[in-house]
């Protein structure tokens, strides 16, 4: 497994890339995740993911993790996992893969950065 700080960098990047993807390329995003009725909401969630990723990336770049950074990372992870589980029931099972990815990131915010 990656050292916690590097894993946190991957986590931040994951939010930026997947959030931007939802905003920039609707066709490929829906090809993977399934069609969406209210795409403005997808863009909003994408923008929030980019913002969270940028904030977490800032902590990684500074090499300093504050309690607020950990809270933001874990609360956002929990929110995405809850949404993914719900979406997997009614939409695409691909969302369960996202749950696994998020579980992989949790140790980055619970273990000390060295």
Question: What is each PLM-predicted segment?
Answer:
Residues 1-114:
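Short amphipathic, positively biased membrane-proximal segments
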């Amino acid at each position: 497994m990656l050292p916690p700080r590097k894993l946190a960098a991957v986590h931040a990047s994951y939010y930026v890339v997947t959030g931007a993807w939802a905003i920039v390329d609707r066709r490929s995003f829906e090809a993977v995740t399934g069609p969406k009725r209210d795409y403005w909401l997808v863009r909003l969630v994408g923008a929030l993911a980019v913002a969270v990723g940028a904030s977490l990336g800032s902590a990684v770049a500074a090499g300093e993790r504050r309690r607020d950074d950990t809270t933001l990372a874990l609360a956002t992870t929990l929110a995405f996992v809850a949404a993914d589980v719900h979406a997997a029931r009614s939409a695409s099972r691909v969302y369960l893969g996202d749950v696994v990815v998020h579980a992989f990131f949790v140790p980055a915010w619970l273990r000390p950065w060295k």
